[in-house]
Amino acid sequence: MGKPTGFMEIDRQTSREIAPEERIKNFNEFHIPLHCDEQQAQGARCMDCGVPFCQSGMMIGGMASGCPLNNLIPEWNDLVYQGRWDLAAKRLIATNRYPEFTSRVCPALCEAACTCGMATGSPVAVKENERAIVEYGYESGTIHAVPPPARTGKRVAVVGTGPSGLSVADLLNKRGHKVTMYERADRVGGLLMYGIPNMKLEKWVIDRRVKILKDEGIEFITNADVGRDVSAEELKENYDAVVLCCGAKKPRDIGVPGRDAEGIYFAVDYLTSVTKSLLDSDFADGKAVTAKGKKVLVIGGGDTGNDCVGTAIRQGCTGIMQLEMMPCPPETRAPGNAWPEWPRVRKTDYGQQEAIAMFGRDPREYQTTVKEFYKNEAGQVCGALIARLESKVVDGRRMMVPTGEEFSVECDLVLIAAGFLGCESYVAEAFGVDMTPRGNVADVKYATSQPKVFVCGDMRRGQSLVVWALREGRDTAAVVDESLMGYTNL
């Protein structure tokens, strides 16, 4: 490495965040990048550790340790330190075709497995370096459209333009196959466009990449709902292969009394309405579900729940509570959660930070669930009965069960962010592919039960991270390519 003692001499530094009180005034990204010299110094913190777990992508204890894309992290960290930004960009995109997405929305599995983090408590700022590299790549022209030099004559349809779909389409196109992508929404991006709010991923970032993909020869057809508006038979007849990348979008519901009250929404529907209204009219059309002037109850403690908290605060809610079924995680790793496992520790994300700044308390209520929704005479939700939970072993299984303690809260808007139960079934039914008991499309190495129909991403593996969707797209592209050509060089 360029500076073997860098991790001892230089402190970890990340991008500056706009204060919560200021950033909630708009839906813009709120991270201010480091100066170039500061970023290069962060590259020097990468150790010559011998075994770089940061790029391993191993599964330990059922969770990923290190980057699933096997990014060449020590290489481009050192290149950042040396100021060799062009080569850093080339080495980055050698394994990750979409670093502008992962550097904004990935939870940084690489940093959790960083040896420097284990040794000093402060991992290398890998995610920040990644973002600096990719933005340099765009500004310098290092990242630009490179159409394939020749075409194979094969045609592939990709259903869904989320991260897995974009990943598989990009590689198959570069191989020379003619790729057409179908998207049921009005904009390309899937989860990236409408499932992640603008302050985490501004949508011009997606549009910038899509322009390159178009210039490279990929065709995008929006407002095309395959399985309804576009028949499966049409795609199978007109293409040599079809790849299903429709995500895991069937939300888990809360089946309790009062669920039929007005003012209760699934989180993804809420977030979609807000982002679409923002992009269409800067909210002038009044079509966004709004939390303005309302007391909001968010059910679910994951990333989507946090996004709902941040969005509701930006809309002007007057109060917010977030329910989490599980106990509060510890502040530091428990003895049974050793490095390089993913740290199961308490994390206060941007939405919770903003709630603390606005309302003086963390919005999360751990070990709770909804027992009943209350509604007024007009049928509008006006409150909820909350049950406290505890962890117990029941019939040999540990689960969260009611303690008997209950309390009521007022709420005018309820957002259900309780996870997903697999993919929406109509696309799978249209293609006649087998399903798993968990509601995902069954496969053998990404091939479904139907000839020349493949599947990847959350539609295959279930709800997951963007980085895993990109990995799935990369792996699936090689399988599809081999099926078309008899061999693959992807």
Language-model features, listed with the residues they occupy:
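Beta1-alpha1 glycine-rich phosphate/pyrophosphate-binding loop at the start
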Residues: 5-32, 41-44, 70-80, 90-92, ...
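Glycine/serine-rich phosphate-binding loop and adjoining beta1-alpha1 elements at the start
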Residues: 40-44, 48-56, 62-148, 214, ...
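Beta1/beta-strand and adjacent pyrophosphate-binding region of the FAD-binding site
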Residues: 151-161, 292-302
